[in-house]
Every structure is written in structure tokens, then in C-alpha cells.
Amino acid sequence: QGLPSFFAYLLGALALLVAFMYCYSRLTPHHEWALIRAGNAAAATAYGGSILGFTLPLYSAMAHSISYIDFILWGVVAFGVQIATFFGLKLFLRRQGESLSQHITEGHQAYGTLVGSISIAVGLINAASMTW
């Protein structure tokens, strides 16, 4: 029972992670992979922070869920929270007259760090919320 469960959770988590990375990079207005290949540290920092911000609650869901289906459902919640975090920050900055994607595309490291840090912070809060 132990080894099959291990592989089920591992493969489920990896599938959710790959799906998150793919969807996040498709939903954001800038093109993370192209920017990262070009050496854009702001894009790498923002994208890396969002990945960590997703995997923190994914870990919590894996550790605290009562079943595999419960884990997957909480993983989907974590997915949605991270996507909403990016778009919430984007909307907030737009109201300040700034384009988040433009700053990241232009390699402004401060904005990449801001996105990455907020993504991790929200991920930690999300993970703690899953410890019921």
C-alpha cells in the first residue's frame, strides 16, 4: 500500500506542477520562457516565485488531505489562488498607472522580485490555511 500511494501522490503532484507551469506561462501577458531564455532575471524571479507559491500549498495539501481526491482538489485550489494572485497584482499596478508585464518584459528586477515575493507569501498563507 505504501509504494503505490507514494507514486500516486508523486505523479499527481508533478502533473499538477507541470499543468500550473504551462497554464501560468500561457495566461500571463508576457512570455516567461522566451524572456528567461534571453536572460531576463525579472521574468525568472517572478516565474520561480509563482512556482514556489504554488508548490508550498501543494505540499500542505499532500501532507494534510484525507484522500488522494482531496489532495487533487486542494491542489486545484492552490492553482487558482496563484493565478488570481498574479492577476490581482497586475490589476493593482494597472490602477497605479503601471504595466506589470511591461516591467517584467523590460527586465526590471524589482518587479520580478515583487511578483515572486508576493507569490511566495500568498503560497505560505494558502498552505497554512490547509492545515485545518
Enumerate the predicted regions with their spans.
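Juxtamembrane boundary at the C-terminal end of a transmembrane helix
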Residues: 124-132
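A generic, lipid-embedded transmembrane alpha helix
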Residues: 42-62
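Membrane-interface helix-loop junction between the first two transmembrane segments
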Residues: 19-38
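Alpha-helical transmembrane segments
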Residues: 1-16, 68-83
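Membrane-interface elements of multi-pass transporters and channels
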Residues: 26-31, 65, 91-100, 132
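Mid-bilayer segments of alpha-helical transmembrane spans in multi-pass integral membrane proteins
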Residues: 79-91, 113-125
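Interfacial loop-to-transmembrane junctions
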Residues: 95-119
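Alpha-helical transmembrane segments of integral membrane proteins, especially early/N-terminal helices
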Residues: 5-11, 35-47, 79, 110-115
